[in-house]
Amino acid sequence: IALLSEATQPPMKTIEVGAHKLGGETVMMRHEKTLVNRNLFAATLCTCMDDAKIEARIEGIKKVDYERIGEREMVECVFVHDAGDSAKFVELCKKAAALPDRTVIIDTKDVDTAKAAVEAIKDNKPILNGANKDNFEAMNAIATAAGIVLGVHGADLSELHDTVAALEKAGN
């Protein structure tokens, strides 16, 4: 029965992101069947942006929030990219986490920066995006300790597959 159960699982696991679910789809195209979990929309903030542009982007994120055909349409996620300034990155993550009903995606490959950012906003259950073949063990430890989702990068599909396989072997 376990083998049958495994064979009938959707090709992509369902993950919970804030109040939303992603994945768990059994079809690739909407016309094949209805999609089970809707897409989430994200806006990007980056440490490479000046303060005025960051504030303008945050105000724009707040404005995109309306109801259409009985469904709330909004920017559900804020993707915060690290361009090398660790202190500014952590502060930017805090600003993004202060936006209500938004999930923060922490995008950094630097383990120390990731640790500081996750520690600063872990109660908001962000996504830690930045594990790769070189840092996946440390990133996995950070994500597992905080109980959050870990995003993985790879130079190509083969590298991505190998990194994900190593993470699954480690229990993630």
Model region roles, listed by residue range:
Residues 3-162:
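Active-site beta->alpha loop and helix N-cap motifs at the rims of alpha/beta catalytic domains
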Residues 158-172:
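Active-site/ligand-binding-proximal alpha/beta "capping" segment
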